């Protein structure tokens, strides 16, 4: 039996996979942006800053590894973004938020 394929036309292909690992400083940036936008949203009374803070917080929590987790590093951005959103929508001065 002869093989009908021509060896000169065979091209080996390697599957390229995108790395799903976050870069080294990416997690800290998500946490930092969450805290910064949370403070800006509370101090300047901007709801959009509070929502950006919440999105950065969710991105931070979704990429967090168990070895990186400590209570303080998790609780700071989460509490600040949630506190800002609660103040913006349910607080006594919620009409002042833009």
Swiss-Prot record:
Annotated keywords: Membrane, Transmembrane, Transmembrane helix
Pfam families: ASTER
UniProt GO cellular component terms: endoplasmic reticulum membrane
Any GO MF annotation of the entry: protein folding chaperone
Location(s) in or outside the cell: Membrane
First-listed, main subcellular location of the protein, grouped into a coarse class: membrane
GO BP annotation list: protein insertion into ER membrane
TM helices/strands, residue ranges: 32-52, 78-98
Topology in the lipid bilayer: Multi-pass membrane protein
Domain of life: Eukaryota
Family: Belongs to the Asterix family.
Name the record gives this protein: Protein Asterix
Origin species: Dictyostelium discoideum (Social amoeba)
């Amino acid at each position: 039996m002869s093989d009908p394929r021509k060896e000169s036309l065979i091209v080996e292909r390697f599957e390229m996979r995108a790395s799903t690992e976050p870069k080294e400083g990416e997690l800290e940036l998500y946490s930092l942006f969450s805290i910064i936008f949370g403070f800006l949203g509370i101090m300047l009374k901007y709801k959009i800053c509070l929502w950006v803070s919440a999105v950065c917080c969710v991105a931070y929590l979704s990429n967090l590894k168990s070895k990186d987790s400590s209570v303080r590093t998790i609780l700071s951005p989460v509490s600040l973004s949630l506190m800002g959103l609660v103040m913006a929508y349910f607080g006594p001065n919620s009409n002042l938020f833009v």
